[in-house]
Amino acid sequence: LLAIFAMMLHRTHQVHIASVGRVGDSEQFRNIERHTATTFDGLLLLRIDESLYFGNAQSVHANLMRLSDDTNIHDIVLIMTAVNHIDLSAQEMLCAFNQSCIKRGQHLHLAEVKGPMMDILKTSPVIENLSGCIFLSANQAVQSLTKPSTDL
């Protein structure tokens, strides 16, 4: 039983975070290392492929910081389709990442957050202090964030 728990902890500690892009003209977004996909200037789309909790929050934070460390990136979208659970430690990690984004002049957005997850997050500091927006889909995020500015 202890071995099974150790294996599970090890597997969930190393969360896969994929940089994704649009496949063709579709509304599908896939890992740019595995598929021919279009990326967008100034926009980083990252799909988190595991639930977030105390056991992986530190490694997720380190990976997010590494992947977003580019002065050309203005908007970061975390695609949360595979995130079924988030504990308090992971919420604190997302708040810290959001603050890092703000300091670097970046906006952090969330997309495809499941209903039960949103129920947890909607009263948390994650949403209260989010520097960006919450989108229903990655496609909606891309459409909104890649529109030419109409400010004069």
What is the role of each PLM region?
Residues 1-123, 128, 152:
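The feature marks cytosolic C-terminal regulatory regions of anion transporters and related permeases
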Residues 71, 114, 138, 145-146:
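Low-complexity, intrinsically disordered or weakly predicted helical/coil tracts enriched
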Residues 129-144:
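Short acidic-hydrophobic, aromatic-tinged amphipathic segments that line or gate anion-handling sites
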Residues 143-152:
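Intrinsically disordered or compositionally simple regulatory linkers and C-terminal tails
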